[in-house]
Amino acid sequence: MAQHKINYTQNGGLPVALTSIDKIVNWGRSNSLWAMTYGLACCGIEMMASGASRYDFDRFGTIFRASPRQSDVMIVAGTLTKKHAEFIKRLYDQMTEPKWVISMGSCANTGGMFNTYATVQGVDRIIPVDLYLPGCAPRPETLQYGVMLLQKKIRANKASRAQVAKRLM
């Protein structure tokens, strides 16, 4: 009996069911973000304010967690020193896949005004960053808008297609 290998990647087409699965899974992921806060300086104060009742991140599905094993989003806010770099890398590695990182504020994005031997000039030199929030210190509304942008990015992800294509090859 002849066996034919089906090439699903031909013409860019995978089974149609994966598109629906992607939408459902990404909708669930985007509306249940568990964020681990890593507040290091002034931006940490604004991040704490965003967790209060006035901004109510819970209505967007974002819940702040203290453990990296319970989180899928890391929010790095403030100046990252070289001594902290090892710890932030370890915390990032403890997070389960899929995971995202938000860099909040000028100091986390580029090192800010602290261009010294002891500071890391941007979190993206240690861990991959998905979203940069500018400002010194960014207001809670900026973080709220950033979470909404991250949700939009997650909904556009094609995770199951990449996983199936990897298994079929």
UniProtKB/Swiss-Prot annotation:
GO terms under cellular component: plasma membrane; respiratory chain complex I
Cofactor: [4Fe-4S] cluster
InterPro entries with a match to the protein in the record: NADH_UbQ_OxRdtase-like_20kDa, NADH_UQ_OxRdtase_20Kd_su
Biological processes per GO annotation: aerobic respiration; electron transport coupled proton transport
EC number: 7.1.1.-
Cofactor notes: Binds 1 [4Fe-4S] cluster.
Enzyme class at the top of the EC tree: translocase
Subcellular location: Cell inner membrane
Record: residues binding [4Fe-4S] cluster: C42, C43, C107, C136
Endpoints of the signal sequence: none
Reaction catalysed by this enzyme: a quinone + NADH + 5 H(+)(in) = a quinol + NAD(+) + 4 H(+)(out)
Database matches in SUPFAM superfamilies: HydA/Nqo6-like
Transmembrane segments: none
Gene3D superfamilies in UniProt: 3.40.50.12280
UniProt topology in membrane: Peripheral membrane protein
Highest taxon, organism lineage: Bacteria
Key word 4Fe-4S present: yes
UniProt keyword annotations, A-Z: 4Fe-4S, Cell inner membrane, Cell membrane, Iron, Iron-sulfur, Membrane, Metal-binding, NAD, Quinone, Translocase, Transport, Ubiquinone
One protein family per Pfam: Oxidored_q6
Assembly behavior: NDH-1 is composed of 14 different subunits. Subunits NuoB, C, D, E, F, and G constitute the peripheral sector of the complex.
Function: NDH-1 shuttles electrons from NADH, via FMN and iron-sulfur (Fe-S) centers, to quinones in the respiratory chain. The immediate electron acceptor for the enzyme in this species is believed to be ubiquinone. Couples the redox reaction to proton translocation (for every two electrons transferred, four hydrogen ions are translocated across the cytoplasmic membrane), and thus conserves the redox energy in a proton gradient.
Family recorded in the similarity comment: Belongs to the complex I 20 kDa subunit family.
NCBIfam families on file: nuoB_fam, PRK06411.1
Protein name per the record: NADH-quinone oxidoreductase subunit B
Source organism (scientific name): Sulfurimonas denitrificans (strain ATCC 33889 / DSM 1251) (Thiomicrospira denitrificans (strain ATCC 33889 / DSM 1251))
